[in-house]
Amino acid sequence: MAVEMFYDDDADLSIIQGRKVAVIGYGSQGHAHSLSLRDSGVQVKVGLKEGSKSREKAEEQGLEVDTPAEVAKWADVIMLLAPDTAQASIFTNDIEPNLEDGNALFFGHGLNIHFGLIKAPENVTVGMVAPKGPGHLVRRQFVDGKGVPCLIAIDQDPKGEGQALALSYAAAIGGARAGVIKTTFKEETETDLFGEQAVLCGGTEELIKTGFEVMVEAGYAPEMAYFEVLHELKLIVDLIYEGGIARMNYSVSDTAEFGGYLSGPRVIDADTKKRMQDILKDIQDGSFVKRLVANVEGGNKELEALRKANAEHPIEVTGKKLRDLMSWVDRPITETA
C-alpha cells in the first residue's frame, strides 16, 4: 500500500506560527524541535523539571524554560518528548490539569497513546510528529536548509484541524523539505518497537555476541573475533544505509558476497522468522508494554539486571581494550563501552 506524502507546498507554516508551543524535554529530539520551531518564527517554551541538567543548556541557547506544568498552562500545543517511561506521570501530574478545550497534545512516538497509558480528554487534539532521524541530524539538516523525513499521525481530532496542524509543525522543524509521511499511531508504534527489538538492537546485539562466542570457543583470539563480528559491522551498515543491500553486495568482495548468500539463510532461517513473528505478536497484543510498565513500577530492577549482565559479556572487555588503541573513535559516555 502506497503511503501518502506531503511537502512544503502542502503545509501552511502560519498555523503553527499562530500557536504557542511547549516542548517537554530537552534531549536529542527536544533540543532539535525547540530550536527549529523558534527559528521558524514559532513561540516556544521548554518544559523541564526543577534541577534538570538540561535547563542551563536550553537557556544558553536562548530558549525560555519553566516547569512542565507552567509551560503546559501557557501553551496551546504541547509536544511531549520526555522518555516513554516518564510520559504517563508527566501527563497526569503536569499536563492534564492544565489542558483546555482546543489544545493539542503531540508526541514524537506513539507508545503511550496506542497502548492506552495516556488518555487525553476528548476535546483535545492528539497527534504525532516523528522525524526519522536523531535530533542532532534533524537540527543540522534544518540549519543547512534541508530536512529529515517525518511521520505524522492523528489519533484524536475534535475540530478536524489535526492533520493541518501536524503538517505545519513538521514543516517548522524542516520535515516537509524532505517529505512527510502520513501514518497511524498503531503503525508507527508497532513497527518502531519491532525494528528495535528484532533487528536494530536486540537482533543485531545477539548476532554479534553469538558470533564472538563461536569464534572464541573455537580457539580464535578474542581480539580477532571482535574485529570480525563487531568493529567491521559499521563498514557494512554504512554501505547499506547509503545504497541498500544491493549497494553493499556490490561494494564487498565476490568472496564475501557469495559466502553471505550461502550462509546468511543458515543463520536466519524459517524458525528465526517464526520467532520474529512471535515478537511482533507480543508487541501487538500489549505483552511487551505490560512488561515494560511492570519493570518501571518495580524500580527498573529487571532492566538493571539485564544491563549488568550485558555489560559483563567478554566482548565488552575486549572491545574497551581495542578501542583504547583507536584515536579516531569518539570516547564512550558509558563505563562499559
From Swiss-Prot:
Residues 3-183 form the KARI N-terminal Rossmann domain. Binds 2 magnesium ions per subunit. It is an enzyme of class 1 (oxidoreductase). The keyword Transferase does not apply. Its cofactor is Mg(2+). It catalyses: (2R)-2,3-dihydroxy-3-methylbutanoate + NADP(+) = (2S)-2-acetolactate + NADPH + H(+); (2R,3R)-2,3-dihydroxy-3-methylpentanoate + NADP(+) = (S)-2-ethyl-2-hydroxy-3-oxobutanoate + NADPH + H(+). GO terms for cellular component: cytosol. Keywords: Amino-acid biosynthesis, Branched-chain amino acid biosynthesis, Magnesium, Metal-binding, NADP, Oxidoreductase. NADP(+) binds at residues 26-29, 49, 52, 54, 84-87, 135. Signal peptide: none annotated. Pathway: Amino-acid biosynthesis; L-isoleucine biosynthesis; L-isoleucine from 2-oxobutanoate: step 2/4; Amino-acid biosynthesis; L-valine biosynthesis; L-valine from pyruvate: step 2/4. Belongs to the ketol-acid reductoisomerase family. Involved in the biosynthesis of branched-chain amino acids (BCAA). Catalyzes an alkyl-migration followed by a ketol-acid reduction of (S)-2-acetolactate (S2AL) to yield (R)-2,3-dihydroxy-isovalerate. In the isomerase reaction, S2AL is rearranged via a Mg-dependent methyl migration to produce 3-hydroxy-3-methyl-2-ketobutyrate (HMKB). In the reductase reaction, this 2-ketoacid undergoes a metal-dependent reduction by NADPH to yield (R)-2,3-dihydroxy-isovalerate. This is Ketol-acid reductoisomerase (NADP(+)). It comes from Mycolicibacterium smegmatis (strain ATCC 700084 / mc(2)155). The gene is ilvC.
